[in-house]
Amino acid sequence: TDTIMPVISHWGNGWHGLDALTNIWNVILGLAVFFLARVLGALYFINNIDDKELTDKCRRAVLNNTVLFLLFFLAFVIRTLVSDGFAVNPDTQEVYMQPFKYFTNFIEMPVVLILFLIGVVLVLFGIGKTVLKKTFDKGIWFTGIGTVLTVLSLLLVAGYNNTAYYPSYTDLQSSLTLANSCSSEFTLKTMAYVSILVPFVLAYIFYAWRSIDRHKITEKEMDEGGHSY
């Protein structure tokens, strides 16, 4: 071990994390994210491209990819809610397996549960109205915001309420929790000051995307080439 840069962790086997690919539920989650990304991309095109033929194809793509997304997403969520979770004893910091831990987290954190349900409803509303109403092109706003809320709530369920967010399968007590993996007090204070800039960053992102998406892309614009903002 180097005294200047000591090794504070190591892989439990020679796979260096690649063995996560052998976990079918990791693959199922990855497929859910993949098809959701395709749905969001198609919704964005519908909102920003003025071409009936292309938007009609995008609407069909939304429907087809939504079916596959829901298949994998529901399977992952249901399995997560009924499986054992990696709980942390708040007094001893001991990590242990608790039945229905993530379902319990939802019950014990009702605000997170509400965020999750709102997110799911927004995702389904944006997709459903886009598919059923041919003139509706704002689905990306509902589905996009719903995706953010849903992902945020799942992350909170996986890491809050005395839960190990990065479990170790070779040594349960080496699992990462918010308590044993947070930065030093100095770093946390520094990042707290840096976070003051977040509203300005968000404002810039909003301004930039609003400028880009102010007018829908047309076939004529694509034929002319060049750049216009």
Where are these regions (language model features)?
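Long, contiguous internal "core" modules enriched in hydrophobic/ aromatic residues
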Residues: 1-139, 153, 157
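Juxtamembrane non-transmembrane "cap" segments at the membrane-aqueous interface
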Residues: 2-4, 152-173
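Short, membrane-exposed interhelical loops at transmembrane-helix boundaries
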Residues: 95-100, 166-188
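Hydrophobic alpha-helical transmembrane segments of integral membrane proteins
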Residues: 112, 119, 146, 190-192
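Alpha-helical transmembrane segments of multi-pass membrane proteins predominantly involved
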Residues: 125, 129, 183-217
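Substrate-recognition/cap regions that form aromatic- and gly/pro-loop-enriched pockets
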Residues: 135, 157-163, 175, 182, ...
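Central hydrophobic cores of alpha-helical transmembrane segments
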Residues: 140-149
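Short, highly charged, low-complexity non-transmembrane loops/tails of multi-pass membrane proteins
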Residues: 214-229
